[in-house]
Amino acid sequence: MARLRETYRNEIAPKLSEQFKYKSPMQIPRLSKIILNMGLGDAIQNIKILDSAAEELGMISGQKPVITRARQSIAAFKLRKGMPIGCMVTLRGDRMYEFFDKLVNVALPRVRDFRGVSSRALDGRGNYTLGIKEHIIFPEIDYDKIDKIKGMNITIVTTAKNDDEARTLLALMGMPFKQ
């Protein structure tokens, strides 16, 4: 079982229950899934970029990504409906907790000029979205073997009803918010 899941059950959940005065243990907010998305506009001209991005996203997440396709044609971008334009992974369970642990303790501290993540990136429904400009902050990526530095979006979906509960949950789990 993931280390962070144990910490959540034994320490974080009781603190949240005490702070927000929940009547039922099912009301306590928890992580439900983490979505990693890599949108690649360059994949229109060169499909090989998409293959390397999918391989790297698979190394970061520990599971095979699904290729995302264009929903509609956009002539200005020379994009046709159904063309592959990115890849994504949805993490749940132990893999989700292990990824979150790695993100907070290993990857984010490796970001250049890192002073914490914005606490304003919550969406009002308890979900947090984080944009990363360089995927090389993850320890699985070998800097010598990559052809191009790519960015990604990380969406952390929680069962929290509002931003305050989600912010408290993520802060207790170790998310380094700006002061």
Curated annotation (Swiss-Prot):
Keyword Magnesium among UniProt keywords: no
Record-level Gene Ontology MF annotations: rRNA binding; structural constituent of ribosome; tRNA binding
Gene Ontology cellular component terms for the protein in this record: ribonucleoprotein complex; ribosome
Single Gene Ontology BP annotation: translation
Annotated keywords: Ribonucleoprotein, Ribosomal protein, RNA-binding, rRNA-binding, tRNA-binding
PROSITE patterns from the UniProt entry: RIBOSOMAL_L5
SUPFAM superfamilies: RL5-like
Quaternary structure annotation from Swiss-Prot or TrEMBL: Part of the 50S ribosomal subunit; part of the 5S rRNA/L5/L18/L25 subcomplex. Contacts the 5S rRNA and the P site tRNA. Forms a bridge to the 30S subunit in the 70S ribosome.
Function: This is one of the proteins that bind and probably mediate the attachment of the 5S RNA into the large ribosomal subunit, where it forms part of the central protuberance. In the 70S ribosome it contacts protein S13 of the 30S subunit (bridge B1b), connecting the 2 subunits; this bridge is implicated in subunit movement. Contacts the P site tRNA; the 5S rRNA and some of its associated proteins might help stabilize positioning of ribosome-bound tRNAs.
Protein name: Large ribosomal subunit protein uL5
Organism: Syntrophobacter fumaroxidans (strain DSM 10017 / MPOB)
